[in-house]
Amino acid sequence: FIMIKPDGVQRGLVGEIISRFEKKGFSLKGLKLITVDRAFAEKHYADLSAKPFFNGLVEYIVSGPVVAMVWEGKGVVATGRKIIGATNPLESAAGTIRGDFAIDIGRNVIHGSDAVESARKEIALWFPEGIAEWQSSLHSCIYE
């Protein structure tokens, strides 16, 4: 599960971010532009509820629209995290999304699931209606 946060949407980075995942060879299975309410944001970030930055994070996520996405492909969670970069943009390498587009940890452009199990939970939360089932005609060009 990948979410472009309000700063990424406001700054017009949606196309660039989608392009990076597509160019890597991943398939887009779900996409929605949505503004979430506080209760939904709190549910999404429930694992961080005891952290001192929790309320600020929730306020930030509800401050504008986000783009929620589901990507599929071999190693998509681990590779997605590498494409995104470190949580703290100052620790992110150039060439990563956060390394190229973010400065502050509190405005780091994008969220990516940290594990396959987290991705399953987040996809169920954000896409209760399910995702598109299709396979790119380029699949055989990307995978053995």
Swiss-Prot record:
Cofactor(s) required for function per UniProt: Mg(2+)
Keywords noted in UniProt: ATP-binding, Kinase, Magnesium, Metal-binding, Nucleotide metabolism, Nucleotide-binding, Phosphoprotein, Transferase
EC number assigned by the record: 2.7.4.6
Pfam families: NDK
The keyword Magnesium is assigned to this record: yes
Active-site residues, as the UniProt record annotates them: H111
GO biological process, one term: GTP biosynthetic process
Residues annotated for ATP binding in this entry: K5, F53, R81, T87, R98, N108
Signal peptide: none
Record's function text: Major role in the synthesis of nucleoside triphosphates other than ATP. The ATP gamma phosphate is transferred to the NDP beta phosphate via a ping-pong mechanism, using a phosphorylated active-site intermediate.
The protein's name in its UniProt record: Nucleoside diphosphate kinase
Species of provenance: Solanum lycopersicum
